[in-house]
A protein has these predicted regions:
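Intrinsically disordered, low-complexity terminal tails
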Residues: 1-314
Length: 314
């Protein structure tokens, strides 16, 4: 609440300038009719108010997938924290990354990690607000970051997550979407993008017996790198059940429309499994789908950290 009041106070003197800036951004956004429709579709799907700020925040999330985490975990963010506070904030950031790594196994864990991320982001923004050289542009960026975090929390309630993951080249965001089906079946979509490895997307279908999946990249070398881990992927994805995995290089890979769509643009409506299934069946389904997600994310993180380190040494 204090941060909201500080942001509101800082915005008072340049409200008209903010409006002009927002209008300019929306004018630019409207030039891409397809992207504009996607953004409004996502906002409507998750019952998020289509305010100007939310539209701009969603547009930024779609176009700059790692932007939120770069602002939170980047070392260049301005601030007025004292040295001891900087150390405390750095430890909190490390803890959030560790907690997210452990949290992927369950929706409850991811919800708790999301709350911790919001607390760290609030401390980052407080430091910017207190900075002697804070500008109106900084204020706008903070408003956008605050809106993005709020949107992320609302989407997480529908099992659509943005997960920060540490690699040797920095923190990147992994998008995870879980779509439940009947019984123990369902879909798991995972997408990400890094500077060194380009776009990576995976979709897994949990069937009655085993898992089928497609793992793709827009770069041939990354596709071959992922293919080299086929034995590891197959072994861990579904607790010993058969895994039928395929790999592809797709030059024009569109992460926003891969499988169900990174933000659920193309996803079918979630089935009302919580009411129709027994608690036992629901928990078994949850354990299975989130195990698939956790296993793939861990494998990819280990793979990218290793190759990033090799690239840095080269």
């Amino acid at each position: 609440e204090q941060l909201k009041e500080a942001l509101a106070q800082a915005q008072t003197d340049d409200a008209s300038q903010d409006y002009a800036y927002a209008k300019e951004q929306l004018d630019q956004l409207s030039q891409s009719a397809k992207m504009t429709q996607d953004i409004y579709t996502v906002l409507q799907k998750y019952d998020i108010p289509n305010t100007m700020t939310n539209v701009m925040a969603m547009e930024a999330m779609v176009n700059d997938r790692n932007g939120v985490f770069r602002q939170i975990f980047g070392e260049s963010a301005k601030g007025s924290h004292k040295e001891e506070n900087e150390e405390q904030l750095a430890r909190a950031k490390e803890q959030v990354l560790e907690d997210f790594g452990e949290a992927i196994a369950s929706p409850e864990g991811l919800a708790a990690a999301q709350e911790q991320l919001a607390e760290v982001a609030e401390n980052v923004m407080k430091g910017m607000i207190d900075s002697d050289d804070v500008t109106s542009l900084d204020i706008r960026e903070m408003r956008l970051l605050s809106a993005q975090l709020s949107i992320g929390s609302m989407m997480a309630k529908e099992e659509q997550y943005a997960i920060p993951v540490q690699t040797e080249s920095g923190v990147v965001g992994i998008s995870l979407k879980v779509v439940r089906g009947d019984g123990e079946k369902g879909l798991v979509d995972i997408t990400m993008e890094t500077k060194l490895h380009g776009k990576i997307a995976a979709t897994f279908q949990a069937k009655e017996h085993g898992v089928s999946g497609l793992i793709a990249s827009d770069r041939e070398d990354t596709k071959e790198l992922l293919d080299s881990r086929q034995e590891s992927f197959t072994a861990v994805l579904d607790s010993g059940n058969e895994a039928d995995l395929h790999y592809a290089c797709i030059a024009d890979l569109d992460l926003n429309h891969f499988s169900t769509g990174v933000f659920g643009v193309d996803a079918p409506e979630q089935q009302e499994t919580t009411e129709k299934q027994s608690d036992t069946t629901y928990q078994v389904q949850t354990t299975r789908l989130y195990h698939i997600a956790e296993s793939f994310v861990r494998q990819v993180q280990d793979l990218l950290q290793g190759t990033d380190a090799q690239g840095a040494d080269a």
